[in-house]
């Protein structure tokens, strides 16, 4: 949390729950995020997802969902990761894996790049090796992981799209949080009963 929240929690003897850091919230939120990503790709390209070459950067909760969705629509999906267990899972799920340090070698035939890594990975060097028609969708939290200034200079369309759940499916996004909060409150009631409060 922020220093203000951390201070508030320590001075009031309260518990801070970082909802958006929770695995369950992130996994549920990956559903509207994927739908929003598909919507953006369809809006900003003049070719089908089917048969296109898609590169997903990061294989966390969102990256995995994005890769699966694009593969299920017939895209050829390459996934970049750093951790060996992610490379193994990428391989097991029938995506084409690559190590992030090799991104410059891998991007030469890519139509769509979808970044989920919240630090600069789509650098000027990477962008300079992309085909001119490549679309970059950056799902990482602000400021994203893309050199947007260089992309614009090169004529590559690069879009920063954090917070898609609240934009494309606000009712679902609210329901996800309501469900998790209800679960947390129920767990708290049970814990208090067990502690005799």
Regions found by a protein language model. Give the residues of each.
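Rossmann-like adenosine-cofactor binding region
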Residues: 90-166
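Glycine-rich adenosine-cofactor-binding loop
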Residues: 50-71
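A glycine-rich, Thr/Ser-enriched phosphate-binding loop motif common to dinucleotide/cofactor-binding enzymes
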Residues: 23-42
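Glycine-rich helix-loop-beta junction characteristic of Rossmann-like nucleotide cofactor-binding loops
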Residues: 44-49
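NAD(P)-binding Rossmann-fold cofactor-contacting core
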Residues: 73-93
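Conserved Rossmann-like nucleotide-cofactor binding loop
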Residues: 62, 85-86, 142
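Hydrophobic anchor at the start of a short beta-strand
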Residues: 16, 77, 97
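Rossmann-fold NAD(P)-binding glycine/threonine-rich loop
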Residues: 1-21, 25, 139-186
């Amino acid at each position: 949390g922020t220093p203000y929240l951390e201070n508030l929690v320590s001075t009031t003897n309260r518990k801070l729950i970082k909802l958006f850091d929770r695995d369950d919230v992130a996994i549920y939120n990956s559903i509207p995020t994927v739908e929003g990503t598909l919507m953006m790709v369809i809006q900003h390209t003049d070719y089908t997802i089917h048969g296109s070459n898609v590169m997903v950067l990061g294989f966390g909760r969102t990256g995995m969902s994005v890769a699966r969705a694009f593969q299920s629509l017939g895209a050829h999906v390459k996934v970049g990761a750093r951790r060996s267990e992610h490379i193994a899972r990428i391989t097991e799920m029938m995506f084409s894996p690559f190590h992030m340090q090799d991104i410059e070698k891998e991007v030469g035939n890519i139509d769509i790049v979808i970044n989920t890594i919240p630090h600069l990975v789509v650098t000027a060097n990477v962008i300079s090796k992309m085909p001119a028609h490549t679309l970059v969708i950056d799902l990482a939290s602000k400021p994203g992981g893309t050199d947007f200034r260089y992309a614009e200079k090169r004529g590559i369309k690069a879009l920063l799209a954090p917070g898609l759940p609240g934009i494309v499916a606000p009712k679902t996004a609210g329901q996800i949080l309501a469900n998790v909060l209800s679960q947390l409150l129920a767990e708290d009631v049970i814990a208090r009963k067990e502690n005799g409060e």
